[in-house]
Regions:
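Glycine-biased, small-residue-rich flexible motifs in mid-sequence functional cores and linkers
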Residues: 3-295
């Protein structure tokens, strides 16, 4: 693995975030042994409290389908998906997030100019092109090695408010990410699998040890709502309500004041142009769709 030749560099804006710097992710400061620097390509603003989705590299069709499905659901709720870019469940999670139209973050084991696996280069470029980021704690040309993949798992868990484990055998490197999540006081969610499936033995063991089970879409949406404050999409599709989708996405992602909404790049311009009248109309639409509830002033 250390003899991998450098791949064609990803195209995009490059950034370096030193520990304690203005744009360094605050949630990483709380983990044991936070990275001294983050090197990245893409948008550093997406390194917020997302959801990590991980699982087996040699995933079954079930594992890949579930990773894609739940990543897409979370993405449709405005949640950023964070994973390691590996084959199998990781790749499926990144693709599901892109399908749901939210940005996704790839945390590499080597430097950002040493793409691994090389077969995922086009996927990583799409991640960058669609507003996400590819990051590493190592310098650009640092080669991926077995120990660097174990070490990067703490970053995947640390950037996330919760970690969803889709498939994991015994033994499994996925357990290290679960351990990192628990040591950083993050939630561990697990999708159960057949007890006869080798790729689900580790996941089922984590459930036995007390991880939160995710058994269907409804339980997943409930957990997403509780962890991220996201509103349920129900039968509404963002594109069907025009400009209201901008407001809806902003409200899903975080609780914001009117002033804070105006500062957001994607929705600030419409707000500044149309001001309060537009805002009240759009909020009324969302309430009519039963997506939000506007309480009376006390």
């Amino acid at each position: 693995m250390s003899e991998l030749r450098p791949t064609k560099p990803l195209e995009g804006v490059r950034f370096i975030l030193p520990y304690g710097g203005e744009d360094y992710p605050e949630q990483l400061m709380d983990i044991p042994d936070p990275p001294k620097k983050l090197y990245g390509i893409g948008n550093p603003q997406v390194l917020t409290c997302g959801l990590s989705v991980i699982g087996a590299r040699k995933a079954t069709p079930y594992g890949r389908d579930v990773a894609f499905k739940f990543a897409k659901i979370a993405s449709e709720h405005g949640v950023t998906i964070i994973s390691g870019g590996a084959l199998g469940c990781d790749s499926a999670a990144h693709r599901g997030c892109l399908e749901g139209e939210s940005p996704t973050v790839v945390v590499l084991g080597g430097g950002c100019d040493r793409i691994y696996p090389e077969s995922n280069r086009d996927l990583f470029q799409e991640v960058v092109d669609k507003g996400g980021a590819v990051i590493s704690e190592h310098q650009w040309q640092f080669p991926p090695m077995p120990y660097t993949f174990r070490a990067r798992n703490r970053i995947i868990a640390g950037l996330s408010r919760a970690t969803l484990i889709v498939e994991a055998g015994l033994p499994s490197g996925t357990f290290s990410t679960a351990d990192d999540a628990l040591s950083s006081n993050r939630e561990v969610l697990v999708v159960p699998g057949a007890i006869t499936s080798p790729t689900s033995r580790g996941a089922n063991r984590l459930l036995y040890q007390g991880a939160t089970p995710i058994v269907d879409e409804e339980t997943f949406e409930d957990v997403i709502f509780n962890l991220y404050g996201c509103l349920k999409v129900q039968d509404m599709r963002k594109k069907e309500i025009g400009e209201t989708s901008l407001l809806f996405a902003a409200l899903q992602a975080e609780q914001l004041s009117i002033d804070a909404l105006m500062e957001k790049d994607d929705i600030g311009a419409p707000l500044r142009e149309k001001r309060l009248a537009w805002l009240m109309v759009e909020l009324a639409k969302l309430e009519h769709l039963s997506l939000i509830h506007i309480s009376e002033p006390t």
